[in-house]
Amino acid sequence: MPSLKDVKVKIAGVKKTKQITKAMNMVASAKLRGAQQRIERFRPYAAKFYDMLGDLASKADSSVHPLLEVREEIKTCGIVLATSDRGLCGSFNSNLITTALKLAAKKAAEGKKVKFYCVGKKGRDAARKTDHEVAMALADQMGSFDFQLANRIGLDVINAYLARELDEVIMVYGEFVSMAKQLPIALPILPIAPKEEEAAPAAPASNKEYIYEPAVEGLLAELLPRFIKVQLYRGLLDTSASEHAARMAAMDNATRSCDDMIGSLTLLFNKTRQASITRDLMDIVGGAEALKG
C-alpha cells in the first residue's frame, strides 16, 4: 500500500491537471461561439453564391472556361487537407488524416500522382511522413484567419490546375454538424461540377430566373476563381469550429476523469490513513500487554 505522502502528491497533481483541463474547456467554449458566429454569417452568402453560380455554369458549355473542363485523363490529384495546429482535441485530427490518407492511397492505386496542400501542423506532419509530395504546408494559421488564407490556397491550386500540374482537387476538412458531431468530409473542388452534381450546402429551392450582364463567359472568368475560394473558406471555417467543439468535449471528458481519479485517490488516502491508525493502535495495545506481562 502506498504511503500517505505519495497519495497526497498524486491527489495534488490530479487537481492541478483538472484546473488546466477546466480552463482549456472554457477557452475552447469561447472560441467555439466565435467560430459558430462566423459560420452562421457566412453560410447564407455561400448558399446564394452556390445557387447563382450553379445556374450560371449550367448555361455555359464546359469548354467556355478551363475550370469547368472535366479532363479525360486524371494524372495528378491535389488534396487540400485542413487540420488543427494543436492537439488535445480527441480523435478530430486523426479522423481527418485517416480520411486524407485513404483518399491518397486510393488515387495512388489508380496510378495517379498525389500532391498535398496542408493547412495545420497536424496534417502537415502526417503528409510529410508519406511518399507523396507536399506542395504547400501552412502552419500556425488556424488559430486566427480570414478570407485571405482561402485566397492564398485558392490561387495556388487554381494556377496549378490551369498549368495542368493538377487535374483534380479535393478538400478534406471537418464539417461542423453540432457540438457533439463533427464529420470528416472529402469535397471535390476542381473541376467545378455542374449544378445538379454540386457537392455544396443545400440552399432553399429557388425559382428565380437570373439575368446576367455582360456575357456569361465574362462573368464566369471572374466568378469561378472566387467560387473555389468560397468553398475553401467554408471548409476552413467548419474545420475551425469542429476543432474547438472536439477540444471542448475532450477537455470536458478529461475533467470528469480527473474528478473520478480524485475520488478514487481520496478513498485510497482514507483507507491508507485508517490502516496506519490501526497499526499504531495495535502497537500500543501490544506494548501495553507486554508491560503487563
Curated annotation (Swiss-Prot):
Membrane topology type: Peripheral membrane protein
Subcellular location: Cell inner membrane
UniProt-listed GO biological process terms: proton motive force-driven plasma membrane ATP synthesis
Keyword Nucleotidyltransferase recorded: no
Keywords recorded for this protein, A-Z: ATP synthesis, Cell inner membrane, Cell membrane, CF(1), Hydrogen ion transport, Ion transport, Membrane, Transport
HAMAP family for this protein: ATP_synth_gamma_bact
Family stated for the protein in its record: Belongs to the ATPase gamma chain family.
Summary of the function given for this chain in its UniProt record: Produces ATP from ADP in the presence of a proton gradient across the membrane. The gamma chain is believed to be important in regulating ATPase activity and the flow of protons through the CF(0) complex.
This protein's name: ATP synthase gamma chain
Species of origin: Nitratidesulfovibrio vulgaris (strain DSM 19637 / Miyazaki F) (Desulfovibrio vulgaris)
